[in-house]
Amino acid sequence: MQIKIKSKEKYLIGVSGGSDSMFLLNKYKNQDVIVAHINYNLRPEAIFETLLVSKFCQKYNLELKILSFDSFKIKKNLQSGLRLGRYQFFEKIYKEFNCTKLLVGHHRDDFLETVFLQKKQKKIVTFWGIHKKNNLFNMEILRPFLYWRTKKQIIRICQQKKIPYLDDQSNFTGKYQRNQIRFLLEKKSDFSLFFLFLFYYLINIFKLIILKNQKKILQNWQKTGYNINFFKKIKIKSKIIFLFVNQNFDNVKLTRGKINEIINFICGKSTSGAFLLKKNNYIIKKKWKILPKSSKI
C-alpha cells in the first residue's frame, strides 16, 4: 500500500525529469513541497530535462531549486561523486526550508536491480535491495512507490495522464553495471519479477528480525566497554564485527576476509595493538578492551 502523506509536513522532492520522478512530483504537486533538480552537464540533452522540470513547476506554482553541477571536476569514481554532490545539495535545501522528508521516485524495478547488484558485487548485506525509509545526510528519506509500482506501470500512467517526462538516455546503454542488470531483468516475465520481489521482501522481514537480535548483542558488548573476553564468547562474531565497524566508522569496505582478520586480531594473544581499517581509522586493542578510533593512539 502507498504510504500516506501528512499535509502538515513539508517535503523535498528530488526530480530529474525522468518518468519516475515526474510521476512522483505529479502525485504530490498539491502538497507542501520543494522541488530539487540537478543538471550534471554530462549530456547535451540535459538542458531539456531542466526546462521540462522548470515548466512543470511554473505551471503548478512549485518552489524549484536547481543545481548546475560541474561533473568534470570529479577525477575518480564518477557515480560516487555525483551521488555525494546530489545528497549534499538535497541536504542544504532540506535544512533551509525545514523539510520533514525527502521523497524520491524509486520503484520495484530499482529494488530488484539493487538486489542483483549486491549479489554481483558479493556484498555482505543486512538488507536486500533498497529500504522504503531510511536516514541519510541528516534527512529522512521516503520512497512512496518502492513496493507497489514498476517502471512499466509508471510509464503507462504517465502516458495516460499526459505527465511530461524525458528519461535519461544513458540508462539505455550498457556502460554501467546497473544498466546491464536492468537489461537482464527486462527479459523476465512480469510474474517472475513479482515473485523475485516477493521472495526478497520476505527474506528482508526475516533479516530484520535477526538484525534486531544482533544489535542487542552489540549493545551488550558495548556496555562492557567492548571487553575482549565478552567478545570471545559471542557465537556470531562475524555478524557483530560487521555491525561494530559500520556503527563506529564511515565508508569502510568490509570483505569476509577482512572481518576474519579483525576477529583474529581481537582474539589474538597480544593484549595491545592497532588494526588498520583504512587511512587514519584503527581498531585499538588496549587492556583487554577494543577502542574504535579515527586516528591511532
From Swiss-Prot:
Its EC number is 6.3.4.19. InterPro entries: Rossmann-like_a/b/a_fold, TilS/TtcA_N, tRNA_Ile_lys_synt, tRNA_Ile_lys_synt_N. One of its GO terms (cellular component) is cytoplasm. CDD domains: TilS_N. It is found in: Cytoplasm. Belongs to the tRNA(Ile)-lysidine synthase family. This is tRNA(Ile)-lysidine synthase. It comes from Mesomycoplasma hyopneumoniae (strain 232) (Mycoplasma hyopneumoniae). The gene is tilS.
